[in-house]
Amino acid sequence: MNRAFNRKKDKSWMHTPEALAKHFIPYNAKFLGNTEVDQPKGTEVVKDAVRKLKFQRHIKKSEGQKLPKVELQISIYGVKILDPKSKEVQYNCQLHRISFCADDKTDKRIFTFICKDSESNKHLCYVFDSEKCAEEITLTIGQAFDLAYKKFLESGGKDVETRKQIGGLQKRIQDLETENVELKKQLQVLEEQLMIAQVPPGNSMSSKSPTDIFDMVPFSPMTPLVPLPASNGSAPPPPARPTEIRRDLFGAEPFDPFTCGAADFPPDIQSKLDEMQEGFKMGLTVEGTVFSLDPLEGRC
């Protein structure tokens, strides 16, 4: 049976569900960076990524650069990577996109996770240097994933259906706003044509039509047509309504409040929901491993 959260030696959770659901758990760390990897899971995959980023770090250190400090905020909604001073979000890794998380058993400060980028759909490996709490951070990410997955299952699709309805209504509102703009443009054109038609030629001596006190041509309704009686003396049948869709004088379909419910969900949002479900099904693997025999030297 596929489990959402998998660790070889499960440990009891260290945070309450409320802390991760209603708030977040903060951690301070130093960010070695991220690099693209070929696979969403695998110990060897993250080992290669850690070695690569450590090598890049040694080069930057020789140039006098320091590791940037970051703040991690872990909750059931994801792992945020922020600037500790300005609180500006640098990365926002959603939990269903995180597929692998590991901490180094020889170097207690190093931990890493693999997350699928939301724009490029590439798998990126993030590597951090923490204050000897790498294992605690990986377990916290695992607990957050476990709670988020359970919440997703307990919703029974209700959250998805609610989002579909909201998305359908938002699309309907957008269509109505677009229709409103087009109607305003057509109305402006008709008003301009009406003004041009009412202005007489410059040298015309033709008699003017009678106007009211506002210098407007008075409205004269047409004489209503009286239906002729049938040959047998009975009243004629009412005119048949056209079967085609009714349209207003601007050629637009009239608003129908009964059709503005949950419309078909836009393909882009539907694909995101499908991807979210697929990510939770893939699960999160958390492992404790040995990345390399050369711990990060001269941390600064």
From Swiss-Prot:
Annotated Gene3D superfamilies: Pleckstrin-homology domain (PH domain)/Phosphotyrosine-binding domain (PTB)
Entry GO CC: cytoplasm
Chief location of this protein within or outside the cell: cytoplasm
Pfam family membership, one: PID
Domain spans labelled PID: 21-176
Localization in the cell: Cytoplasm
Function: May function as an adapter protein. Required for efficient phagocytosis of apoptotic cells. May play a role in the internalization and endosomal trafficking of various lrp1 ligands.
Name of this protein: PTB domain-containing engulfment adapter protein 1
Organism: Danio rerio
